[in-house]
Amino acid sequence: ETDVFEALAAVQAEQSIDPNRILVAGFSMGGASTWHLATHHAGLWAAAAPGAGFAETAAYAKVFAPGKEPPTAWEQKLWGWYDATAYARNLSHCPTIAYSGEIDPQKQAADVMTAALAQEGLTLPHLIGPGTAHKYHPEVRQDLTARLEALLDRGRDPRPAKLQVTTRTLRYPGASWLRFEGLAEHWSRADLAGTLRGDTAVDVTTRGTTAVRLVLPGLRQVRIDGQEVALPAPAPEAVLHRQDGVWRAGPPPAGPRKRPGLTGPVNDAFLDRFLFVRPTGKAWHPAVGAWTTAELERARSLWRTLFRGDAPIKDDTAVTAEDLAQSHLILWGDPGANRLLARLLPDLPLQWDARTLTFRGERRDAAHHAPILIYPNPLNPEKYVVLNTGIDFRDHAYGSNSLQTPKLPDHAIVDLREPPGSRWPGRIVSAGFFDEAWR
């Protein structure tokens, strides 16, 4: 999606384009992309037209089929990042028309989205090409084009009077004027519903939400979950947070917290500018040094092969203040080898010396274990620091982008005595998520 938005911005910089008359459409792999962009960024489009593709991982990829290694609990939780079915409610404010060939196996995508939308009380217009496999039926395509042109003529409403939004992560914090600013628990469902009352008042209801941002210039009155909240002088936007069960005006109290742009899991760092930082020193243990060197090269190769770019990389002695300000730092090695990691270690949530790696009270032999971790950078809490991983799917997922979902949560400990394979970088002996305060 980063590529999509950068390409869109480049076109908009050169052409005069009405932002309220942009639609998203695609077929097959482009259909999968459209399901994602429509549900996760619903407030941007005048309409969406996904054709074929896939809309979720489990059923489409048959991950629970006999003989397959079952996904871990954290993998299943992280399907909530990309599954369009988990974000179906957002299509309530994005007119969407699906297309499928009648005999196309990828009709499955529209079928599962129809079911997901029905659970939200919504219906999905679904055009079907009779007797058609994996392509557009010419006459049905003409019908689809006419419908989309009518929706473009109407255009997107930049300030809808009513909004319903849902998310599992603050990576996708809402739409238009109604936005999540804090969640009760990442990867559990959170909902917002809002109704404007004239130009200066709004009613909001929440679920699984601890902070809300209302981008409504001139707003004076807020009723949230039935509670009236007094606002200070009108401003371009208002932030409210819940504390001790009571909604209050203003941002949440200062301190580490998951928020838009800082949510985890480890793959989240690669949706923005990042920098691989390789060690220049000697690892405490040969096994750790060999493993981190191999994993760094694998990460660089994957980035070139799948994402068609060269991952930026610097030595640990060459990182600048500008790098700290602009990039998520991906640190490779152990504190004996990587000087920047050694510098940051006192402010990271683990203890690591030449003998022992300790994380969350569990002590492990540092000769045979290494951490994978994402955490706010102590030198710049607006950015991440990541330890010892690139994009975390491996060879097993290369055959289908439906499998290229996050494989690891916020942190993991790897036993290096099991060599890396097609699914894992070694034996994962523990893995989990930090809470909303990065604890």
Which residue ranges define each predicted feature?
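Gly/Ser-rich "nucleophile elbow"/oxyanion-hole loop immediately N-terminal to the catalytic nucleophile
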Residues: 1-28, 39-45, 90
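Short beta-strand immediately N-terminal to the catalytic nucleophile in serine-hydrolase-like folds
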Residues: 24-26, 51, 99
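Hydrolases whose catalytic domains are alpha/beta-hydrolase-1, hotdog thioesterase
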Residues: 33-37
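Mobile cap/lid helix-loop segments that gate and shape the active-site cleft of serine hydrolases
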Residues: 46-88, 93-94
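Conserved strand-to-loop "acid loop" that flanks and positions the catalytic carboxylate
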Residues: 97-104, 130-131, 206-208
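C-terminal catalytic histidine-bearing segment of alpha/beta-hydrolase fold enzymes
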Residues: 103-198
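Beta-strand-rich binding/interaction modules
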Residues: 189-228
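Solvent-exposed alpha-helical segments and adjacent loops
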Residues: 215-439
